[in-house]
Amino acid sequence: MAKPISMTLSTKSIQDAIKKLEQYRDSLQAKCDLLVSRLAQEGQTVAIQHISESPLGNTITVRVDKAPQLMTSNAILIATGKTVTSEDREPFYTLLAVEFGAGIFYNSKENPKAPELGFGVGTYPGQIHAFEDGWYYWDDKTETWRYTHGIKATMPMYNAEQQIIQQYVKIAREVFGGK
């Protein structure tokens, strides 16, 4: 981690020390970029695993947007789902269903972020079946009524966040070479 830089009070020694400091600064930026990339990859991997557990998983994509800047590194994990619209109903967002669940049958335990974010079982606008064991819905593709118990919340983004929180010290030590 710490790197000692020695110098004397000569012009050449001071210039060498400045050069070493600039190299150290540049290496810190590269290490910060690597840390952010590794943490984002860790989160993306966990999010994809949890998305794939849902029958709606094929409607969701996850990507990392990175924006390295001078002496700053950041990455944003972005999940995008499908919006299903139907006449006389509010839009249904597959990402929200996978993150927070739909229906009480599979979701007796809510996503821990639900109260903070205002989502979860029973919060879908105009919902009337959230606290029932199951319900029928009209499937426009097959033009039939289908029975469902709803969608289990696999919480991909919440679990990605938790994984990053659990792993950041370990990964930082690997990147920066600490013990």
Where in this protein do the model-derived segments appear?
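Short, Lys/Arg-rich flexible segments
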Residues: 1-89, 93-94, 100-179
